[in-house]
A protein has these predicted regions:
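Conserved substrate/cofactor phosphate-moiety recognition/catalytic segment
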Residues: 31-77
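Conserved glycine(s) of the Walker
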Residues: 28
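Short hydrophobic/aromatic beta-strand immediately N-terminal to the Walker A/P-loop
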Residues: 18-20
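N-terminal pre-Walker A segment at the start of P-loop NTPase domains
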Residues: 1-7
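The conserved Walker
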Residues: 24-25
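Phosphate-binding P-loop
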Residues: 7-15, 70-71
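NTP-dependent small-molecule kinase module
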Residues: 148-195
Length: 195
C-alpha cells in the first residue's frame, strides 16, 4: 500500500493574492481604500513615512523592499501606488508568473487639474504635497500604463473619482464591462484600456 506524505498538491492550495490600489496623485486612492478589502500587510509608502518619520525616498525604498520580500516568500499582500513607472507593473508581471491572483482597484479623474487642486488642498491641510509638474507627468504616465494593468490582473475595477467614485470599467478574468458617465464615454474607456 502506498504511503501518503504531508505534501499537499498545489491544486488544493489557495493562490497567493495581491491587491493593488493604483492611480495618479490626488485621484483619491487613500480615500477609497478606507472602504475596500485589503490583505495584510498593507504596504503604503505614505504610511511608512508617517510611522517611521523618514524621507519620501526612504519610505519608497522600504515599501519596495517589503513588496519584493513578500513576493519572494509567496505571501499575499496589498499595496498602494501611483503606478507611473514600469517598476511596479513589472513586479505584478513577476507575481503573475509565480501564480499570484492579482486584483487592482484603479482610481483616476477625467483631468489632471482636479488632481492638482486636490493635492494643493491636502497640503494646505497638513498632508504631503507633490509639485504640479510631477502631478501632470505622473498622471499621463500612469494612465498610459493602464492597458498593462488590465492585461496582467485577474480582476480590475477602474473608478472615475472626478466628483464621486463611479466605476467605469471592470475586468473579471476574460470578461469586460463598461459603464460610461458624463466624463467617460464607452469609446473613451475602451481607448483608455486599449480594448
Amino acid at each position: 500500500m502506498p504511503t501518503v506524505t504531508g505534501n499537499i498538491s498545489m491544486q488544493n492550495q489557495k493562490k497567493p493574492e495581491i491587491i493593488v490600489f493604483a492611480g495618479p496623485n490626488g485621484s483619491g486612492k487613500s480615500t477609497i481604500t478606507r472602504f475596500a478589502k485589503v490583505i495584510e500587510p498593507y504596504i503604503n509608502a505614505d504610511n511608512i513615512k508617517s510611522v517611521n518619520h523618514c524621507s519620501d525616498l526612504e519610505a519608497a525604498q522600504l515599501a519596495e523592499k517589503m513588496r519584493e520580500e513578500a513576493l519572494s516568500e509567496q505571501k499575499s499582500f496589498t499595496f498602494e501606488t501611483v503606478l507611473s513607472t514600469e517598476r511596479n507593473l513589472n513586479l505584478l508581471k513577476e507575481a503573475k508568473e509565480q501564480g499570484y491572483f492579482i486584483r487592482c482597484i484603479y482610481v483616476l479623474t477625467c483631468d489632471y487639474s482636479i488632481n492638482i487642486a486636490r493635492v494643493k488642498s491636502r497640503e494646505a491641510n497638513g498632508g504631503h504635497g507633490v509639485p504640479e509638474e510631477k502631478i501632470v507627468s505622473r498622471y499621463k504616465k500612469a494612465l498610459a500604463l493602464i492597458p498593462g494593468i488590465v492585461k496582467v490582473c485577474d480582476i480590475v475595477h477602474i473608478y472615475d473619482n472626478s466628483t464621486v467614485p463611479f466605476r467605469i470599467f471592470k475586468k473579471r478574468k476574460t470578461e469586460y464591462f463598461f459603464w460610461p458617465n458624463e466624463y467617460w464615454s464607452e469609446s473613451k474607456i475602451k481607448e483608455l484600456v486599449k480594448l
